[in-house]
Amino acid sequence: VTLPNEPAPDTSAETDPGNATAPADAAPGLGALAAARIAVDVLLDGGVRHVVVSPGSRSAPMAYALAEASAAGRVELLVRIDERSAGFTALGLALATGTPAAVLTTSGTAVGNLMPAVMEANHAAVPLIVLSADRPEELRGTGANQTTVQPDLFGEQVRFAADIPAGTSPQRAVETGLSAATGAFPDLPPGPVQLNLAFRDPLVPSPRDGLPEAVERQRYRVGFEPLVMNLPPAPEDLPERRTVVLAGHDAGPVAEAFARAHNLPLLAEPSSNARFGPNAVGPYRLLLEHFGPGSIQPIERVVLFGRPTLSRPVASLLARADIESALYQPVPVAWYEPGRRTELPLENLADLADFAGRGSSAWLDTWLLAGSAAQHALDQVVSEESAATGPSVASLVWRNARGQLLLGSSNGIRDVDLAGLPAPDPAATVYANRGLAGIDGTISTATGIALGGLQETTVLLGDVTFLHDAGGLLLGAGEEQPDLRIVVLNDSGGAIFSLLEHGGVEEGGRYGDAVERLFGTPHSVDIAALATAYGVGHSLVSTTAGLAEALGQPVQGRSIVEVRTDRRQLRQLHARIKDAVSAAVAGVLAGR
């Protein structure tokens, strides 16, 4: 994309995987530190307020320039040894603040470690700026130490990539990168960008120079507050239809407002930030089969907000040939390619209203009564368990969430989706890495969210997810400690696979040991000892009463609440829940 009112740029030093290019200004002989200062000034003028730095020599000019800006109170610097953790920390900062966050690495494998965070940022439309330091052109391809092909390293995962030669000004490339990261170009959603900055020696300032006297930076809490929107009631002349509103990840409060205005049942995933209000239905994924083809009141239409990612019943609903569906898409999104989904994309709420119609009182009441009966049946089954279970832990964490809540992938977010009672009003801002739904980087993401939003933050995750990013617990001496509670559901392995087809294979006996080893991945890690090693507080609970007491404590600094559970009976527990809910819902529908 050429900038408006400008001639087509010279793109010889740049790549275009994200459909946006801009040249580096020719300024031969510009010193490394001078170029770095220009890059930092443009980044900060463009709204970057947080930069995560991983140490390295080739990136030293940027590190020194950032140190100067930090001393002047212009930017918050965080230092992380592990680049993968640094990338996800920056991702969390961008999520919590809604502004671009940057991560700086040296050359070589350091850059490659950012790939998981970049991929997540791409599919989740998060403005993540990769600042990768590189060798100058004359050292590339010569076998020079820590030198590889870094330009275009992230390929189609980034909106924009620029290779900025040593000795040239990075100004225009950085400006274009900021525009691409924040979604300023038409038809491009926000997302990650790569600015590959080549530096030539000398890489350090003169020893005689010193940092300016430090200025305390004014800090403001910029995290999102849970919102409630209001829309005008649906016009009376709209036809009555058996429509449901499905709020997927990142749907936002507009989904709740639309369902309320149109008198329609709301089926909301936890990370939709729409799982509240009078129209929200409880364990909705267990209800869908009762409103299918051949039922007394089959669903006719689906209005989709956000991205549905969590359950097969929802995927089956959207795939039904007897249902018409529409997707509210006012701006470009990153999670699907145009024309690749069956929903009708609609850009404005007026067209969506015409499509959805309005729900009759009987239609909404049926869903609410069925949801209430299902929630009661589920709670009854879960309460019969003497020890803590995934659903009981998820329900407690959901009810006690304040400030910010991050839900880990795998079973954590699905347990909340199943057992989390919709609230009358939103209590916390909910986050989840649903771009690619990986388990990596969850602790680091939570740390970034907590430090960016400056609010108490809770993260719910399983033990495998926790161990995958245990290095995210490492904070250097003097680094800011977030107010972060980490709730670890520890069942000594990967429980989610027992709820998939693999659980049936395991029960068959012949492949039992293989399933446990390959998918269950059992371990005997002492999480308390791990917490001690990283200087993080730890408590161990095994009952819902113990967890409720732990969740009632204020969040000050970092703490781990480990909840021991047994995954061997998880498949049977979910079967009992499904049977109890099915019977309860059938009873409600029979009376309608």
Where does each model-flagged region fall?
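Glycine/aspartate-rich loop-and-adjacent alpha/beta segment that forms the canonical ThDP
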Residues: 3-6, 10, 14-16, 152, ...
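Phosphate/pyrophosphate-binding active-site segments
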Residues: 16-30, 306, 315-413, 533-549, ...
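N-terminal cofactor/phosphate-binding cores enriched in small/glycine residues
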Residues: 29-119, 419
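Active-site diphosphate/adenylate-binding microenvironment
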Residues: 36-39, 57-63, 366-454
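A short, small-residue-rich loop immediately preceding and capping a beta-strand
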Residues: 49-53, 74-78, 96-135, 299-306, ...
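Glycine-rich, anion-gripping cofactor-binding loops and their flanking helix/strand elements
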Residues: 91, 95, 106-107, 113, ...
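Thiamine diphosphate
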Residues: 120, 131, 138-151, 415-592
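Glycine-rich, acidic loop regions that bind phosphate or pyrophosphate groups
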Residues: 121, 132-177, 268-375, 476, ...
